[in-house]
Amino acid sequence: SNKPFTIVGDGKQKRDFTYVTDVANALYLASNYTKTDIFNVGSGKPKSINYLVKLLVGDKVYIPKRPGEPDVTYADITKIKRKLSWQPKISFEAGVKKVLKSINNWHDAPLWTPEKINKATKDWFKYLD
């Protein structure tokens, strides 16, 4: 759409973006791990919201920062790299390109409204009787 991107705060805050296939691969490896453990999954390389919008190419609208919002969040992936030999394969920039390349596939995707969810749920439950 031609709507501007809404950026909370100044856009300099950084987040850890991870492409879905990298997350799926990490979950697969963790599910085959024979010990009980906790792993962080991410890129370990946070990117600013302004940089994301620059890659998306669009106008920006800034709104005030929310109270308590952290400036930087990212995953420490040291343990998952060491124990599962996992690391992300898709760079942030490549991931954004992949999403943009397939974005038109989502234009005709059905939207789930509360009414549609209620109807679908009712339909599902009739098969359980």
List where the protein language model places each region.
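Glycine-rich "substrate-gating" loop/helix at the edge of Rossmann-like oxidoreductase active sites
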Residues: 3, 9-20, 45, 67, ...
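C-terminal "lid/loop" region of Rossmann-like NAD(P)-dependent oxidoreductases
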Residues: 10, 38-39, 47-53, 58-78, ...
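Alpha-helical substrate-binding/gating segment
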Residues: 1-5, 17-39
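Non-catalytic, hydrophobic alpha-helical segments
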Residues: 23, 27, 41, 52, ...
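Phosphate/oxyanion-binding loops and surfaces in catalytic or ligand/nucleic-acid-binding neighborhoods
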Residues: 1-5, 30-33, 55, 59, ...
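An acidic site on a long C-lobe helix of protein kinase domains
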Residues: 16-23, 48, 91-92
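Amphipathic terminal alpha-helices
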Residues: 92-129
